[in-house]
């Protein structure tokens, strides 16, 4: 696919967002190296927010809104604070200031600043930046996927028996499903083991899990109960790296559906989907 902008300033948008993300990364690194952070909980004790999350989102939204009038924003902390998700055709920035806040709180260096750009409800660009390891992933529709400027490619493995999967227990889903969720999650992982999967890994961040698939380190990833800001940016990085992103049922991916499956190949994705007990969520928009 050849890059075909659908807005005359689309490249300007992305270039400026990269500048802001790097600036935000300096803020995150400084806080990561500090002895402690103020931590609050949101929906449960697994849903954390720090003052750094809030400061990064403020920096990104203020910087982008000052430069680009009329743009819309969907930010994790803004929504947690009561902002309504407005999913329109206008240029819309979908932002997770720190994906992997629990990792950040515990000083585990697997975190990501995530910024996705949608125009006319199509994800056009994604930036995923781990400021601790200084790894910046970037993709634009039709331009390919890159890590620190170098092209990345998803695995071509088609077999679960040769695959390493990213998957967690998804304890946040107990808020909606109660203890039934533990049975679902354990059944899903057991089915994958019985199908012969080589191993499981979980990096504590949806975005990090997805870019691991994009760069071919892992072969697949599935998650239920995530949000648009977790997956908007990394979803285009996976597809531009040659991978596939779908609903866990195999139907087309909807960034607002609160669930995702990605894989290096469609064949492995289909086999992974067949291992799952599927659940639904109220769409975010």
Swiss-Prot record:
It is found in: Cytoplasm. Responsible for the provision of inositol required for synthesis of phosphatidylinositol and polyphosphoinositides. Has broad substrate specificity and can use myo-inositol monophosphates, myo-inositol 1,3-diphosphate, myo-inositol 1,4-diphosphate, scyllo-inositol-phosphate, D-galactose 1-phosphate, glucose-1-phosphate, glucose-6-phosphate, fructose-1-phosphate, beta-glycerophosphate, and 2'-AMP as substrates. Required in central interneurons of the mature nervous system for correct localization of synaptic components. Required for thermotaxis. The gene is ttx-7. GO terms for cellular component: cytoplasm. Changing residue 216 to E: In nj40; induces defects in thermotaxis. Substrate binds at residues 76, 98-101, 204-206, 223, 230. It holds the Pfam family Inositol_P. InterPro entries: IMPase, Inositol_monoP_metal-BS, Inositol_monoPase_Li-sen, Inositol_monophosphatase-like, Inositol_monophosphatase_CS. Its EC number is 3.1.3.25, 3.1.3.94. It catalyses: a myo-inositol phosphate + H2O = myo-inositol + phosphate; alpha-D-galactose 1-phosphate + H2O = D-galactose + phosphate. The keyword Metal-binding applies. It comes from Caenorhabditis elegans. Pathway: Polyol metabolism; myo-inositol biosynthesis; myo-inositol from D-glucose 6-phosphate: step 2/2. Belongs to the inositol monophosphatase superfamily. GO terms for biological process: chemotaxis; inositol biosynthetic process; inositol metabolic process; phosphatidylinositol phosphate biosynthetic process; protein localization; protein localization to synapse; signal transduction; thermotaxis. PROSITE patterns: IMP_1, IMP_2. Its cofactor is Mg(2+). It is an enzyme of class 3 (hydrolase). Coiled coil: none annotated. Inhibited by Li(+), Ca(2+) and Mn(2+), but also by Mg(2+) at concentrations above 3 mM. Mg(2+) 2 binds at residues 96, 99, 230. This is Inositol monophosphatase ttx-7. Mg(2+) 1 binds at residues 76, 96, 98. Keywords: Cytoplasm, Hydrolase, Lithium, Magnesium, Metal-binding. GO terms for molecular function: inositol monophosphate 1-phosphatase activity; inositol monophosphate phosphatase activity; lithium ion binding; magnesium ion binding; manganese ion binding. Disruption phenotype: Worms lacking ttx-7 display defects in thermotaxis behavior and localization of synaptic proteins in RIA neurons yet appear morphologically normal.
């Amino acid at each position: 696919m050849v890059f075909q902008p659908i807005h005359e300033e689309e490249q300007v948008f992305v270039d400026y967002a990269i500048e802001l993300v790097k600036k935000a990364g300096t803020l995150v690194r400084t806080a990561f190296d500090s002895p402690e952070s103020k931590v609050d909980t949101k929906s449960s004790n697994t849903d954390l927010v720090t003052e750094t999350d809030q400061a990064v989102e403020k920096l990104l939204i203020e910087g982008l809104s000052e430069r680009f009038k009329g743009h819309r924003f969907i930010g994790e902390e803004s929504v947690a604070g009561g902002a309504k998700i407005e999913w329109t055709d206008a240029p819309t920035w979908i932002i997770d200031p720190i994906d992997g806040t629990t990792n950040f709180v515990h000083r585990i260096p697997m975190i990501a600043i995530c910024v996705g750009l949608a125009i006319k409800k199509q994800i056009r660009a994604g930036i995923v930046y781990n400021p601790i390891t200084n790894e910046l992933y970037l993709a634009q529709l039709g331009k390919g996927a890159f890590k620190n400027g170098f092209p990345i490619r998803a695995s071509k493995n088609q077999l679960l028996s040769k695959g390493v999967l990213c998957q967690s227990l998804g304890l946040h889903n107990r808020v909606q499903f109660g203890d039934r969720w533990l049975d679902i999650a354990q059944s899903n992982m057991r089915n994958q083991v019985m199908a012969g999967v080589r191993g499981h890994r979980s990096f504590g961040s949806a975005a990090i899990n997805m870019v691991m698939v994009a760069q071919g380190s892992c072969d697949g990833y599935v998650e239920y109960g995530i949000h648009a800001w977790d997956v908007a940016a990394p979803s285009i990085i996976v597809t531009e790296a040659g991978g596939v992103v779908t609903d866990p049922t195999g139907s087309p991916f909807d960034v607002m559906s609160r669930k995702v499956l990605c894989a290096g190949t469609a064949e492995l994705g289909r086999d992974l989907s067949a291992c799952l007990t599927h659940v639904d969520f109220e769409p975010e928009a």
